[in-house]
């Protein structure tokens, strides 16, 4: 309770120490994907995920081992449920790769794609967020609501669509059983 200000200061100092230790790598840590939050309530929100899926890395042309070495977090359990999210994160990976300055492991023998000495001198540590999130949906301009749009009850329609999806299996089973009884009656 009374150690709150001191704890805040300790965290600040720890963050500064970590940033110095990992310099010239970004202070924010490794690059993370943009993912949608779970559940109907929050699925419009974008947040940072744990790591990029293997499909995203493959589409961006980056090896899993190489990705971890150049500061890209990888989550092998993650699956892409939509093409849009895959494309967004692949674009994110490509943008990161283009801005990246790779220091050679051995200065005497630099590999292909490694930075030159001039580029290495210019390299500075990124202090803020690593590739800040971009808006996924572009907002529409305001316009007048038409009479047809007023007649449609959107909330009810969405609820109905969800109910149809939820009950589709039971309804199909019931229809199949009803169809089987009718066919059975004709045979007898």
Swiss-Prot record:
According to the UniProt entry, its GO molecular function terms are: RNA binding; structural constituent of ribosome
List, as start-end ranges, the regions of compositional bias called Basic residues. 165-174
Ribonucleoprotein as a keyword?
Answer: yes
The biological processes this protein is annotated with in GO are:
translation
Among InterPro entries, the record links this protein to: Ribosomal_eL13, Ribosomal_eL13_CS
Instruction: Tell me a GO cellular component.
Output: cytosolic large ribosomal subunit
Q: Where is this region: Disordered?
A: 165-188
Query: Which keywords accompany this UniProt record?
Result: Ribonucleoprotein, Ribosomal protein
This protein's record includes keyword Ribonucleoprotein:
yes
**PANTHER family in the record:** 60S RIBOSOMAL PROTEIN L13 (PTHR11722), LARGE RIBOSOMAL SUBUNIT PROTEIN EL13 (PTHR11722:SF0)
What is the name listed in the Swiss-Prot or TrEMBL entry for this protein?
Answer: Large ribosomal subunit protein eL13
